[in-house]
Each structure stands twice: as C-alpha cells, then as structure tokens.
Amino acid sequence: MALNPSKEAILKRIRQGLTRRNPLPPEPNFSTDIYSRSEESDLSIVFASQFIHHKGEFYFVENKKELEIQLAQLAKNRNFQHIYVWEKSLIDLFSNSDISFETSEKDFSLAGVGITTCEALIARTGSALISSATLSGRRLAIYPHIHVVIAKTSQIVYDIKDGLELIRQKYGNALPSMICLETGPSRTADIEKTLVLGAHGPKELIVFLIDDSI
C-alpha cells in the first residue's frame, strides 16, 4: 500500500537526518582566561579592592616594625582576647611587641584570634590561599572567630591557577593535605536566603600586607 505523500516526505527527511553527520563542536581552549584581566597593573591594589569588596579588613604596612605597631593597636582597640600564634616566624616577629599571645594549644577551645601566614594572595578574587603545611595547620585559620593573615607583596599573584602553581613548585608531589581559599569572612545564606557571617569559619578576616618590594 502506497504511503500518503506527506508521510513519505516526512519519513524521507528523517532518513536523511539520521544519515547526515553534524560537524563536531570546536575544541575548547582551556588555557585562555575566561575572566577579563584588570586594567590595574599594581596587584596589591587589585587584591585590596576585591578583598574589601568581600567584607575583608585590609591594612598596608611598609615594614615589620609598622606591622607590630598597627597590629598591637588594633588588638588594643578591638580588645582581642585569646590570640594564638603557632608559626615560628610570627612568634619571633611579635616576641618583643605589645601583643599578648599563646604559642601552644593550651585552652585552644577559647581561641578568639588566630594569626597565620599564607601561601599566596589571589588578586582577582581577593582571596588568601591557605594550606595545612605551615605550623598553623588546619585549625588556626578556621576555628577562631577572627583570622589575621600576615602576607607580603611578593606573595600576590593574579589568579587562582598562579597560586596553585606556586604551591606545586614549592611542595612538588608532597602537596599539603588541605589547600583552601579564604575570600572574606565565612558566610552562608542557606536558611531563608538570609546572609550569616561566620557560619563555617572565621567571622572576620583581616589581612596585613607588608611591602617587601624595596
């Protein structure tokens, strides 16, 4: 029985469609940045603007002595309690300052402020790249309500991939068990879309950036 001409035309188009191969989509270029680069050439300015945008507290200091003075003044003005410092370089730095801090794990459950270094600062996102490889470990950057990061201008890189490359070069195949980005205070809006700071980590993130370009 002959098919209806209109049905025959439809079936013919279907058969042609099944035999016709569509061209493959172009290969994506994963090496190309998907974000436009900032026109600002000074990475410290790029970082600071993004960091402040994400509710971080930023201080620029010219040297370690100014860092001691500024941090001691901040601790006094804000009445910082139970400050913990575990990294030897920071313990040595603040040993003669007016900052009172604990260098052991004694009463760590009371920790209010943790002072650590970082692996790098990411300018594009305004983030601190933290790892568990330092003596601060995992807890000191996460548990206290206030996290203070001490960094140098030479540690600023533009993007996340640049920071991860620094870690790869530094540690090789023995990568730290924890590598994370801190972008402003910890936050969540899971419940009724209400923003809550300090949900899964520090309620305040403070960065002191030391100019070591000279």
Where would I find each of the regions flagged by the language model?
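The feature marks the mature, well-folded catalytic cores of soluble enzymes
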Residues: 1-214
